[in-house]
Amino acid sequence: MGASVQERDRTRLVLKQSIKNAVLSHQKVAEAINDDVVENISSIIEQIINALKKDGTIFWCGNGGSAAQANHLSAEMVGGMFKEKNEPLKSLCLNVDTSFITAWSNDNSFNSIFTRQIQSLSSKNDIVIMLSTSGNSENLILAADYCKQNNVTVVSFTGNDGGKLISLSDYNIHIKSDCTQRIQEMHILIGHIICAEVENYFK
């Protein structure tokens, strides 16, 4: 037999409370974005604008859900966020070339998939934006270290304690949370803000 009306009602109440808790958790993390974080976001926007004015490229990369967000935000820069037909901005996501990534990972190392592409594609006016909830992904650490040694600007979005990536970054957005979902929600929010403000500048 199916659940009784009372059981279904109880299940629905539990579900509603769970949804409310998730929203409240999101709000709490969002409200922790203080003036220091806003200052960092402003600096990153200025750096991206300066890079694009010098014909630089904005590269994005990440792993897992952060890879999806990197792809999303790169697409926002190329395609534009608004209805106006603005000029496309030079942006490329480094985790979408499946042929290269699978070949290089199979024959060499997954840890160097981003470093290799940055070696091939980057120049002094470029910026590499790395998204990582932990800040400890080895392929990002190695890529950031390469950038540091070769004067390529690194911007990182991190969470948890920031990991090793913070010290290798020229600019960092750190979300003080240990919940992966909340961290990624803030990353995409801030990424959208950055893309929108950069696009507005070049209207």
Kindly give the residue locations of the regions a language model identified.
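Generic N-terminal amphipathic, Lys/Arg-enriched alpha-helix
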Residues: M1-D36
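Structured helix-beta-strand junction loops
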Residues: V29, K54-D55, K124, L168
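A short, well-structured juxtamembrane/interface segment
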Residues: D36-K54
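Hydrophobic beta-strand scaffold residues
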Residues: I58-F59, V154
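Glycine-rich phosphate-binding loops that contact phosphosugars or nucleotide phosphates
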Residues: S66-K203
